[in-house]
Regions:
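ATP/NTP-dependent adenylation/nucleotidyl-transfer catalytic domains that generate, transfer
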Residues: 6-7, 161, 220, 229-232, ...
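Enzyme catalytic cores with a strong preference for nitrogen-chemistry domains
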Residues: 1-362, 380-389, 416
Length: 651
């Protein structure tokens, strides 16, 4: 396991009904292929040794003997392999014939897990041939040349790296209370399911939803393998489904209705799952109730089974799963996500306006992304409350660095949205203030810049008093993380609608609104604002009036910072893992040295600027990451970042 990842595979082998030799050969080929890719655990379909559709042939002793002999051959085949294989087999325990999953490693049967829920409806008649795990008493049997305990107890397997996995067989996942509920609450992090799921119209979508929900509810990974082409089509068809889920997200799947064998591999982030569980108090509380079954009384005891340590040299780790370079962006449902985020912001502001009986909002509009989004939210909130847009006082405050482009866009946007407007140049007041404190007014230092930000905030606050209104904050989540705001300047407001919206998402939201509006002049201004370089415009523009001070030159690309922010806050990853993931996500766009530089900068700025976040104004949470000191993020302002920076230096 590297960086908290474990590589797993779900296989759909070629199968012939009751031909155990052919089936074993197909299984071995896929095991070798998976081992070559560094897979640590591979799962096969239900009854992959015999074929699922043997029906009454399961009563034939020859088939049972052939199956056991095939298992002996598989044990011999895996003797020198580190990979853990989970295969489906019929197993006799006294008078009972059980539908089982065998866990095999290094030529040994690590464990045998019998199926609990046997479907006996519609096209399924499993109770005709098999007994349930609930019919079984713990029994040691001699099988495939080894002595193995077969038990109804919850079996939890542990790899040499401490990863815990459990097993369900097909119908188990469809039960009202699946075995995976108790297994995951007992510590299992990956569930493997050996299945033989028939195809029906609509069933595939339902199955995906079922697996996603179970994975999400149990904060686990779910690896599913169902038999495909080669099973009998006498009355049903097996389409060959294979999925890998991680906390509700599908990270890999097989091609449906393929005639060929398939091997689906991916890496599961065990560290992320563990972080989720530690953070989720509901999951922790549910673990306290796991020993009592509300239907049948006390649940069976759990049994821990240790897998064997690695014999061979560890292969070089390669990550095959795709890492989204913009984790805050849901590319598959972007329009719906933007509308949802926008409405959360609108509803938050609407509630604050109703509560305060406020019918006047004061907002500074610069022609940049953040103030544009805040203004759009404000307009939608006023419309929703059926308030006159004249109650929105949009103020543009040109300064030393204001460019013609941003000024023009700000003025056009305010005019076309039909809000009340005011223009106040901050230059005279800032010059006077700088002279009052002994500044030469020509040195472009932090005093020069911050004086402008605080002057703008003072104007907005005073106007709010004058008009009996509230100041709407415009700063975003990314700026708060980096401390890229002036303390008691743009840092302060009476309600901050963008406080949990990262910069990369702000851009998408403004783009979304530009595509939805029917006012072409508004759309044109919004599109140009999206294309404008991000800048606080606190130092003079160049000779042509163009932006000279570009934020990303100082703090790094926002797409990198938002990537760092997401994994640092959402999952608590250490810098080395964030660096590794960033190199995967931005391969070909940023060099490793550049990523390291900006990661170091991000961590340092994040720690140093906590004092600004400790006194944030109220604002709505829109996603899973927030820096509100009253909600998601509580951190001492004087915390030391030495260890984090030291790890980055060693990369």
């Amino acid at each position: 396991m590297k960086y908290g990842f474990i590589k797993v595979a779900t296989a759909i082998p070629e199968v012939r009904i009751a031909d155990t030799k052919f089936n074993l050969d197909a299984i071995e080929k896929q095991i070798i292929a998976a081992e070559g890719q560094g897979v640590e655990i591979i799962v096969f379909p239900e009854f992959c040794i015999t074929g699922y559709t043997c029906q009454d042939l399961f009563r034939q002793q020859l088939l049972l003997d052939d199956s056991e002999h095939a298992m002996m051959m598989l044990l011999d085949f895996t003797r020198q392999l580190d990979i853990i294989a989970i295969v489906g087999i019929p197993v006799c325990v006294g008078p009972l014939l059980l539908n089982c999953a065998a866990v095999v490693q290094h030529g040994k049967i690590i464990g045998i897990v019998p199926k609990t829920y046997l479907p006996n409806y519609a096209e399924f008649y499993e109770k005709r041939w098999f007994a349930s795990a609930r019919d079984l008493c713990p029994t040691q049997i001699h099988y495939a040349g080894q002595t193995v305990l077969v038990t109804p107890a919850r079996q939890i397997f542990r790899t040499a790296d401490g990863v815990k996995f459990g097993i369900e067989i097909c119908e188990d996942i469809w039960a009202p209370i699946p075995p995976s509920n108790a297994l995951t609450l007992a510590g299992v992090e990956i569930m493997f399911n050996l299945s033989a799921s028939t195809e029906q119209i609509g069933k595939h979508h339902y199955l995906e939803s079922l697996l996603a929900q179970q994975s999400a509810r149990t904060l686990s990974a779910y690896v599913y393998s169902s038999c495909g082409f080669g099973e009998s089509s006498q009355d049903v068809v097996f389409g060959g489904n294979a999925f890998i889920y991680e906390n509700g997200s599908q990270i890999a799947k097989a091609e449906r209705f393929s005639l060929d064998p398939q091997l689906v591999t991916s890496e599961i982030d065990i560290e992320k799952l563990r972080t989720e569980r530690r953070s989720n108090t509901t999951f922790v509380n549910a673990q306290k109730d796991m020993y009592v079954d509300p239907i049948g009384g006390v649940l069976p005891e759990k049994t821990y089974i240790n897998c064997l340590p690695r014999q061979n040299a560890e292969r070089e780790f390669t990550l095959t799963r795709k890492i989204n370079p913009q984790p805050f962006i849901q590319s598959s449902h972007m329009e719906a996500a933007c509308e949802e985020v926008f409405n959360i912001q609108v509803m938050g502001l609407a509630k604050r306006l109703v509560h305060t009986h406020c019918k006047k909002v004061v907002i500074g509009v610069s022609g940049g992304l953040d103030s544009t989004l805040a203004l759009l939210v404000c307009v939608r909130a006023f419309d929703k409350l059926k308030l006159d847009r004249n109650g929105i006082l949009a103020v543009t405050m040109p300064g030393f660095g204001t460019s013609k482009r941003t000024y023009t866009n700000a003025v056009a946007l305010m005019k076309e949205l039909g809000v009340d407007t005011k223009e106040i140049s901050i230059v005279p007041s800032v010059v006077q203030h700088l002279k009052d404190i002994g500044h030469d007014t020509v040195t472009h230092d932090s005093t020069f810049e911050n004086a402008q930000a605080r002057e703008r905030t003072q104007i907005l606050m005073d106007l709010a008093n004058e008009y009996n209104g509230m100041v709407l904050g415009t700063g975003d989540l990314s700026e708060l993380a980096l401390g890229w705001c002036t303390y008691n300047g743009d840092h302060m407001s009476m309600y901050a609608v963008n406080a949990s919206v990262p910069k990369t998402l702000v851009r998408h939201l403004v783009t979304y609104v530009s595509g939805m509006t029917k006012n072409e002049k508004v759309a044109e201004a919004l599109r140009d604002i999206v294309d404008t370089p991000i800048s606080p415009e606190l130092t003079p523009a160049d000779e042509e009036g163009k932006i000279q001070q570009k934020t990303e030159d100082f703090v790094g690309p926002y797409e990198l910072n938002d990537f760092f922010l997401y994994y640092f806050l959402r999952h608590g990853f250490q810098p080395s893992k964030i660096y590794f993931l960033a190199n995967q996500a931005f391969a070909g766009k940023y060099e490793a040295g550049e990523i390291k530089k900006w990661l170091y900068n991000f961590v340092g700025r994040f720690f140093r600027n906590q004092f600004k976040r400790s006194c944030l104004p109220d604002g709505p949470k829109v996603g899973t990451v927030s820096l509100s000191p009253r909600g998601d993020w509580r951190m001492p302002s004087d915390a030391d970042c030495t260890n984090w920076l030291a790890e980055i230096e060693q990369l």
